[in-house]
């Protein structure tokens, strides 16, 4: 019974907060957008920069946990897996990033068998990366060596460019980022993988500023796809 009461208390509190925010907006308060950002931080930061420039009085709080947030931005391995009330922003191919000096760099593609002898650069504490890695090598008797582990995509790119290892990357996100140019992306021939980026409104209240931000998100990703 206690859990049921707590659940309803949380709902009532959330509704009260939404009502207070709606009143504040009607009085001209620009307010805050509470964003849960679990994917595509590099791309979303570009949208944030433009939005804040145009709407300097709107503030953002960014979290990795959805509770208490207005908007979730995340990715899944298939567009079929996005939540019912979510909006698909983009689907992009997962490729293998290698140094331009890599023997297969000029071919543009690689097989799973050819990847077995590669030294990989792991992205630590990134469930989506671990999911791709495990999925691709799930049917293999062994997995490739993890040569380095880092939690910074910039460091990851530097290590790849130096020829110290290879890594799986999201193709559009990678090519849209300011990363080393001497890196080639290889298509995975026999085990293609993709990821779908989406946004999902979380609260019952959606401010006008949030609607504008969502629209700018859609426009930005639409332009990336063109």
Residue ranges and their predicted role:
Residues 1-25:
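Alpha-helical "hinge/linker" immediately C-terminal to small N-terminal DNA-binding modules
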Residues 29-81, 150:
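Central regulatory/effector-binding core of bacterial HTH transcription factors
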Residues 68, 126-184:
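Hydrophobic hinge/microswitch elements
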Residues 80, 101-111, 191-193, 203-210:
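Short helix-loop capping/hinge motifs at secondary-structure junctions, enriched
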Residues 82-94, 98-120:
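Flexible hinge/capping segments at coil-to-helix
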Residues 85-94, 171, 180-194:
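Short beta-strand->loop
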Residues 104, 118-140, 207-208, 224:
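Secondary-structure junction motif
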Residues 183-226:
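A late-sequence structural motif
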């Amino acid at each position: 019974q206690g859990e049921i009461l707590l659940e309803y208390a949380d709902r009532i509190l959330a509704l009260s907060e939404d009502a207070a925010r709606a009143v504040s907006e009607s009085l001209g308060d620009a307010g805050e957008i509470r964003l849960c950002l679990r994917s595509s931080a590099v791309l979303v930061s570009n949208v944030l920069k433009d939005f804040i420039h145009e709407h300097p009085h709107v503030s953002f709080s960014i979290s990795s946990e959805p509770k208490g947030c207005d908007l979730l931005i995340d990715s899944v391995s298939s567009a079929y897996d996005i939540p019912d009330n979510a909006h698909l922003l983009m689907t992009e191919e997962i490729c293998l990033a290698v140094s331009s000096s890599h023997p297969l760099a000029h071919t543009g593609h690689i097989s799973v068998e050819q990847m077995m002898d590669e030294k990989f650069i792991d992205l630590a504490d990134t469930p989506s990366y671990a999911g791709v890695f495990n999925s691709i090598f799930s049917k293999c008797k062994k997995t490739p060596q993890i040569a380095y582990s880092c939690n910074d995509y910039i460091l990851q790119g530097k290590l790849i460019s130096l020829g110290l290892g290879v890594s799986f990357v999201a193709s559009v996100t990678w090519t849209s980022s300011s990363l080393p140019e001497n890196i080639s992306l290889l298509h995975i021939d026999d085990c293609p993988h993709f990821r779908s980026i989406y946004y999902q409104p979380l609260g019952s209240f959606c401010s006008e500023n949030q609607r504008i931000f969502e629209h700018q998100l859609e426009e930005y990703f639409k332009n990336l796809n063109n």
